[in-house]
Amino acid sequence: MTDLPFTLDQLRILKAIAKEGSFKKAANSLYVSQPAISLQIQNLERQLNVALFERGNKKATLTEAGSLLLRYGGRILALCEETCRALDDLQNLQGGTLIIGASQTTGTYLMPRLIGLFRQRYPQVAVQLQVHSTRLISWSVANGQVDLAIIGGEVPTELQDVLQVTSYAEDELALILPKSHPFSKLGDIQKEDLYRLRFIALDTQSTIRKVIDKVLSQHGIDSSRFKIEMELNSIEAIKNAVQSGLGAAFVSVSAIAKELELGIVHWAQIENVTIKRMLSIIVNPNRYKSKATETFSQEILTLFVTPSQHKTLGDKL
């Protein structure tokens, strides 16, 4: 059998250089010396008889041949990792790694608790959590970098035929006010009252912001007329701003369970308006599904109930 003109280590090095943008940073990330990295790439180029990087640039830039090898090499490495994980599974959850993805709010407030439950039952399984935008997490699932993910938005159009999307649970979005706000003394507030508030909001491209705008529009409320005091990219920063009396905000109920319990923000009900979004589980049906993934789905995810139902996971355990 003819020997391959490259090794897995060389593919890992190529991938690291492309990711880090330089030989030095790639060497640091792989805990090897820069000369060792350079020598491996020189040997690889000689074996393939092609140049993999543009010479003369400060940044390590792949040639067309380098990009081609990176694309196929990434698939080879992913398949090797999949094979190792399948073999680990033969030990019946006595090892291996579970990689879970989540969009921002879900990853911050829901997943740590569910992962904690899983780790109590299967302490030998290492669990990694990746939290990014819905778009980035969807691509990570599609590429096999994440086993499954829970997202609060829609899968990108180009991945809808690739990923399996399953409705999971409803997540209610609450209008929160500072405890000192006059509206906190009222019952339900009227739709017109929303135009009198000053809002702390996520940026217009965020999934939650889009859901809020859509649902409010369906109820005849024009969110473009809202007075936006400031836009922040962190739910924690938004909650702190509300607690400090800077304005009102819409956030997931799962993000304010502690604040409601301590009574430091007010959940204002809007008359005849409830804002909800659907959380979804996404997987790539064409990728290997580990026992850890199946177990997490069947034993842990089924325990979830929405905070707006005033229940806890403990009620079901």
Curated annotation (Swiss-Prot):
Q: Which UniProt keywords apply?
A: Chloroplast, DNA-binding, Plastid, Transcription, Transcription regulation
List the GO molecular function terms: DNA-binding transcription factor activity; transcription cis-regulatory region binding
InterPro entries linked to this entry: LysR_subst-bd, Tscrpt_reg_HTH_LysR, WH-like_DNA-bd_sf, WH_DNA-bd_sf
Where is each HTH lysR-type domain found? 6-63
GO terms for CC? chloroplast
Q: Which residues bind DNA?
A: 23-42
Source organism, top-level taxon = Eukaryota
User: Subcellular localization, per the record?
Assistant: Plastid, Chloroplast
Q: Which Gene3D superfamilies match?
A: 3.40.190.290, Winged helix-like DNA-binding domain superfamily/Winged helix DNA-binding domain
Purpose: Trans-acting transcriptional regulator of RuBisCO genes (rbcL and rbcS) expression.
Similarity section: Belongs to the LysR transcriptional regulatory family.
Q: From the Swiss-Prot or TrEMBL record, give the protein name.
A: Probable RuBisCO transcriptional regulator
| Native source species | Porphyra purpurea (Red seaweed)
